[in-house]
Amino acid sequence: MMRENPELLLGQVLGDSLRFVSIIGAGAYGVVYKAEDIYDGTLYAVKALCKDGLNEKQKKLQARELALHARVSSHPYIITLHRVLETEDAIYVVLQYCPNGDLFTYITEKKVYQGNSHLIKTVFLQLISAVEHCHSVGIYHRDLKPENIMVGNDVNTVYLADFGLATTEPYSSDFGCGSLFYMSPECQREVKKLSSLSDMLPVTPEPIESQSSSFATAPNDVWALGIILINLCCKRNPWKRACSQTDGTYRSYVHNPSTLLSILPISRELNSLLNRIFDRNPKTRITLPELSTLVSNCKNLTRRLRPAPLVSSRYLAYQQQQQQQQMNLQQGIQGYPHQGYMPTQNIGFPWPPTPQFVSNWNHCATPTIPVSLQVLTPNSSLKVDPTTPLTAPIHATESFWPSAAAAAAAVHNNANSYMPITPTPYPNNAKIFGYPNQPPLTPIPFTGFVLHPAPVGRAADAVDPSRKSL
């Protein structure tokens, strides 16, 4: 009954003292209610877990979650589990009420942490303390992410929550457990096979630990904390997946530990700290006590990142010479259906491209501009998604692609949209257009390698199903 009509419980009293006031949220697990103590007015969050349709394994997992949460509930930065009540059709978990919701909302919508090093350090040290307490009693969270962290009555306090994937095993064979953005490399034993052109790229092999039969759960939590720290500082994720074989940005980081410093508004101090957190060898990865000390002593976490132009100064003179051709092309393209997107930056060049253009890999100088690309040639067009394989027009010449790939890799990708456009061909010209569209917490594409061709019309990669809708 509760699963089909959760509103029926509103106004009713649970356990002789808790009146259901409103619904906070709902999911496959059940419903979370806001409840009020009828005697003293104290507010609680009550998670109603459905019992109907659960098999024995699911019931054991449900019981394990509650038992593990209860063991660490007394910590000041972990959501308090007050008591558990059970009826014929549901289990009611009475929890500490946090009216401000989760950290994900505060990072992406309210934006109170970005640029505030003191506030970031305050809440991040609280998270370290909470996770360190869990580890001290032999509990490993395995699903650390902003969605599972609640914000207190003010933004200076946060609480760790949701122990649904927690374990007492220091080593686990549950590869892929957690949320993809926050998984360590060793937690991702299964990797996709490289495509033919990607195989030619210089890729550093994954560490031996990532190929073993199990992975250490404590260092895996440390890795996730590092991603959360970047979320707090920059309002985005550094990569989609910590796999050098399938993720370009992470591959760049493996080859050059200064990659994040060049594409994120972080300080050199924080970059050095992140290098310790993102040590691919879990045995030498920074420990939580070390992490707490270094964060406490870090003076500045962020820095002001000066925006760079999409078109480099070296190419600007050449572009000005082609101004008339660009204006003609611009007048023609205004008739296309852009679905609300307007070009903000562009690169124009003659078709077929000159050897000077092809040899210049600096047409686009920055990966920080939040745009997607439209590449036009006299024969065809495509929408470029820089974090996925570059889609080549059927009639494009091979000499065009090094420069086109460099341009595509130098801009920010919006993986959640796909914008097909069919323009009219323009003789003797080609052009790359940028379109603004920046979702929160999206990965930053790697710049440096030629992206390999893929079938025309490929859609954007699917987003991590564990993420909230943005």
Curated annotation (Swiss-Prot):
GO terms for biological process: cell cycle G1/S phase transition; G2/M transition of mitotic cell cycle; meiotic cell cycle; negative regulation of cell cycle switching, mitotic to meiotic cell cycle; negative regulation of induction of conjugation with cellular fusion; negative regulation of protein import into nucleus; negative regulation of transcription by RNA polymerase II; positive regulation of G1/S transition of mitotic cell cycle. One of its GO terms (cellular component) is cytoplasm. The active site is at 143 (proton acceptor). CDD domains: STKc_Pat1_like. Pfam families: Pkinase (PF00069). Its EC number is 2.7.11.1. ATP binds at residues 24-32, 47. GO terms for molecular function: ATP binding; protein kinase activity; protein serine kinase activity; protein serine/threonine kinase activity. It catalyses: L-seryl-[protein] + ATP = O-phospho-L-seryl-[protein] + ADP + H(+); L-threonyl-[protein] + ATP = O-phospho-L-threonyl-[protein] + ADP + H(+). This protein is a negative regulator of both sexual conjugation and meiosis. It phosphorylates mei2. It blocks the onset of meiosis until conjugation takes place. Belongs to the protein kinase superfamily. Ser/Thr protein kinase family. This is Negative regulator of sexual conjugation and meiosis. It comes from Schizosaccharomyces pombe (strain 972 / ATCC 24843). The gene is ran1.
